[in-house]
From Swiss-Prot:
Bilayer topology annotation: Multi-pass membrane protein
GO MF, one example: oxidoreductase activity, acting on diphenols and related substances as donors, oxygen as acceptor
Catalytic reactions of this protein: 2 a quinol + O2 = 2 a quinone + 2 H2O
UniProt-annotated location(s): Cell membrane
Family: Belongs to the cytochrome c oxidase bacterial subunit 4 family.
Transmembrane segment boundaries: 8-28, 36-56, 68-88
GO biological process: aerobic electron transport chain; ATP synthesis coupled electron transport; electron transport coupled proton transport
Keyword Protein transport attributed: no
Domain of life per record: Bacteria
Identification of the protein by name: Probable quinol oxidase subunit 4
NCBIfam families named among the record's database cross-references: QoxD
Length: 96
């Protein structure tokens, strides 16, 4: 696939997924848990689109290096998310 076409498809897919997430949040009467589940689904799909279309994940000859980079990014993301949640919960419980 041509680079310009690939970037255009990725950009449009990202915009569509973002608009769908906003629509689900603002204009549906689903339960909160259902909304969160759907938004997380859109987020994971959008992360895959970003990795495949913009980060050139499939264009390397050395698959081991790409795998290491993706695993490292996942670990850093999990540390950031879990650490943020932990700090927020600790701050919230100390103010009650």
């Amino acid at each position: 696939m041509n680079t310009i076409v690939k970037h255009t498809v990725g950009f449009i897919a990202s915009i569509v997924l973002t608009i769908l997430a906003v629509f689900v949040t603002l204009y549906t009467s689903m339960a909160l848990n259902a909304k969160i589940t759907i938004i997380f689904g859109f987020a994971f799909i959008q992360a895959a689109v970003q990795l495949l279309m913009f980060m050139h994940l499939t264009e390397s000859k050395d698959g081991n290096l790409q795998t290491f980079k993706v695993l490292f990014a996942i670990i850093i993301t999990l540390i950031t998310v879990i650490g943020t949640y932990w700090v927020m919960q600790g701050g919230h419980s100390s103010h009650l």
